[in-house]
């Protein structure tokens, strides 16, 4: 019984981010799963900064241990290895994606700490389903609690204390991260920094239909406030996010959409932070029985009050792609990002990409 409970709980806690896993150990109330993938990937685009080989490998483990009848401990680690570097620079770009541990106490929920997904991604993940691109208008790495980031203490409650199936909520605290870097003008890589903050999210999923909302608020760092000396950067003392989303996932159909607004948070171009951004993402996919999964999406993020450029589109594109699954372990895909932003004085000044990109890849995963 202990083994069964641990297996079910750990799978439930971590399955949202892990498609497959190989069981390594399962004995005496302890369970350890190993998972990974290798993706041979290439981008084709006129922009030489993005064109070329993007091959990578990913490895992770997730585990749990039965402490007593009411309490289970769990941990999760994931690492990304770049496969396109020469051997003299083999570790360049490698990174820890996830590293956290915590406890789950019966129907009262779970509490963990470490590098994890921010509660904003509870909504952002619903549209981050494209073969290669997508999920990038407001879900950004190490940007407050919108995506993967560090210093997160997260409480999650599933099925509302076991009373309402499908109703989940979370509360999150993020500690201050200065990201000190003397090579930057303002003494830090301020686009990836954050002050103390909190976030809450709630989702309800029933019979394939889902609806959810999230709110976060954080202090901004001194470096971020100093960066406001450039009028292209945000000047507020707090960073805030409001987002809502819907999804449908049943009968081989997948559809999801979200809308969000951020204040003094969303990054754009080559190291700028917008005063205000409004973003919209929508994706539709269909899974054929013979393995083909076509995908169509539209994404847009508009920045407000961007210095002398006023209001501007920071991201806007249509994405057309398809994935073919040979089996549960092997797949191949193509993804075409049709950029709808035209080159202008604004895009040149802040270095926003305007070219289309085609990505082709083949993936083995376990």
UniProtKB/Swiss-Prot annotation:
User: Where's it mainly located?
Assistant: membrane
Induction trigger: Unlike E.coli, constitutively expressed at low and high osmolarity (0.3M NaCl) (at protein level). Expression is under the control of OmpR-EnvZ two-component system; still expressed at very low levels in high osmolarity in the absence of ompR-envZ (at protein elevel).
Highest taxon of source = Bacteria
Q: Where in the cell is it found?
A: Cell outer membrane
Its Gene Ontology cellular component terms are:
cell outer membrane; pore complex
Q: Which residues form the signal peptide?
A: 1-21
Gene Ontology biological process terms in this record: monoatomic ion transmembrane transport
* InterPro entries, per database record: Gram-neg_bact_OMP (IPR050298), Gram_neg_porin_domain (IPR033900), Porin_dom_sf (IPR023614), Porin_gammaproteobac (IPR001897), Porin_Gram-ve (IPR001702), Porin_Gram-ve_CS (IPR013793)
The way this protein sits in the membrane is described as: Multi-pass membrane protein
Name the phenotypic consequences of knocking out this gene: Lowered rate of infection of HeLa cells. Bacteria are seriously impaired in their ability to spread from host cell to host cell.
Keywords per UniProt: Cell outer membrane, Ion transport, Membrane, Porin, Signal, Transmembrane, Transmembrane beta strand, Transport, Virulence
SUPFAM superfamilies, alphabetically?
A: Porins
The answer, when asked if Transport is one of the entry's keywords, is yes
What Pfam families does the entry give? Answer: Porin_1
A GO MF term? porin activity
Q: Which PANTHER family match?
A: OUTER MEMBRANE PORIN F-RELATED, PROTEIN YDDL-RELATED
Q: What else is known?
A: This strain has 2 ompC genes; it is not clear which one has been detected in cell outer membranes nor deleted in PubMed:8359885.
Which NCBIfam families does this chain map to?
PRK10554.1
User: Function, please?
Assistant: Forms pores that allow passive diffusion of small molecules across the outer membrane. Plays a role in virulence.
Protein family: Belongs to the Gram-negative porin family.
Subunit details? Homotrimer. Forms mixed heterotrimers with OmpF and with PhoE; other mixed heterotrimers are also probable.
Entry protein name? Outer membrane porin C 2
In which organism is this protein found?
Shigella flexneri serotype 5a (strain M90T)
Q: Which gene encodes it?
A: ompC2
